[in-house]
Amino acid sequence: MVTGVTAANMTNVLGTAVVPAQLKETPLKSDRRSNKPIMEKRRRARINNCLNELKTLILDATKKDPARHSKLEKADILEKTVKHLQELQRQQAAMQQAADPKIVNKFKAGFADCVNEVSRFPGIEPAQRRRLLQHLSNCINGVKTELHQQQRQQQQQSIHAQMLPSPPSSPEQDSQQGAAAPYLFGIQQTASGYFLPNGMQVIPTKLPNGSIALVLPQSLPQQQQQQLLQHQQQQQQLAVAAAAAAAAAAQQQPMLVSMPQRTASTGSASSHSSAGYESAPGSSSSCSYAPPSPANSSYEPMDIKPSVIQRVPMEQQPLSLVIKKQIKEEEQPWRPW
């Protein structure tokens, strides 16, 4: 038994043993408290980012305008997401059932039983009964002839409309289009396809740029290819001949020359020339002179040198038209200032 240790010493010993443990626990708690707001902030940021991505995906999937649904609450976004996933799940289940051969066989068997019961209905005319049974058989086989024919006709019409050239904006463009592709105007559309005037079959093909082109089949015999080339050459020759005839007709048309406007100088010149001309009214050997060039409108009478164009016999004119008119010019007095 130790009797020399006092109470104060005992407290010092206990204090020295307990204090290090408390010092070790306090830093961990302080670190957790300081890191907790940061972790909470990061967690909220992740949630908000995921919600924003969900909103974008849901609006794109449901084909809604993002401008009208820019402000969606978090609950709305989650609700729309759940509904969309449920719809996708139902669609996948329906597709799996439709692809399952057992379910398909069961459906066909039930449909066949219904058709048999329909065929037993009393009071139906034989023609109407046949049409009804034919319609039901087409439905069970998945063949809808009328709808298929309508879709095919619409596709053919759209292809034919795309193959036709656009209307020209000028006669030159029209002639160029006719010379470049004369075979486009002779294409015949039938139920079996498209045919050229010489009987060649062509296949409408969509090019990478989106336009439609008529392509010859690869299995075309060499003789038919030669015939097609000869036909195209003949069409081009006809187009060139038509263009040459149009150019020749345009050259044969008379050209119209614009007459110059009368000015003071031209009026005086014409008065002098008319005075000399009126002196011989009955002469049959008089010449007609060409008018001055319109390019030089401001000229002097002395610079004019008329050129003889042709001799035209003049007819006898009345006396009142050939009498020379005397113009009295008043002499102005001379003033020195």
Curated annotation (Swiss-Prot):
Transcription repression requires formation of a complex with a corepressor protein (Groucho). Interacts with gro (via WPRW motif) and Topors. Residues 146-178, 259-311 are annotated as: Disordered. Keywords: Developmental protein, DNA-binding, Nucleus, Pair-rule protein, Repressor, Transcription, Transcription regulation, Ubl conjugation. Has a particular type of basic domain (presence of a helix-interrupting proline) that binds to the N-box (CACNAG), rather than the canonical E-box (CANNTG). The C-terminal WRPW motif is a transcriptional repression domain necessary for the interaction with Groucho (gro), a transcriptional corepressor recruited to specific target DNA by Hairy-related proteins. Transmembrane segments: none annotated. Residues 29-48 are annotated as: Interaction with Topors. GO terms for molecular function: DNA binding; DNA-binding transcription repressor activity, RNA polymerase II-specific; E-box binding; protein dimerization activity; RNA polymerase II cis-regulatory region sequence-specific DNA binding; transcription corepressor binding. Ubiquitinated by Topors. This is Protein hairy. It is found in: Nucleus. A motif (WRPW motif) lies at residues 334-337. Pair-rule protein that regulates embryonic segmentation and adult bristle patterning. Transcriptional repressor of genes that require a bHLH protein for their transcription (e.g. ftz). The gene is hry. Residues 31-88 form the bHLH domain. One of its GO terms (cellular component) is nucleus. Signal peptide: none annotated. GO terms for biological process: cell morphogenesis; membrane organization; negative regulation of DNA-templated transcription; negative regulation of transcription by RNA polymerase II; nervous system development; open tracheal system development; periodic partitioning by pair rule gene; posterior head segmentation. Residues 107-136 form the Orange domain. Residues 263-301 have a biased composition (Low complexity). InterPro entries: bHLH_dom, HES_HEY, HLH_DNA-bd_sf, Orange_dom. It comes from the Eukaryota. Disulfide bonds: none annotated.
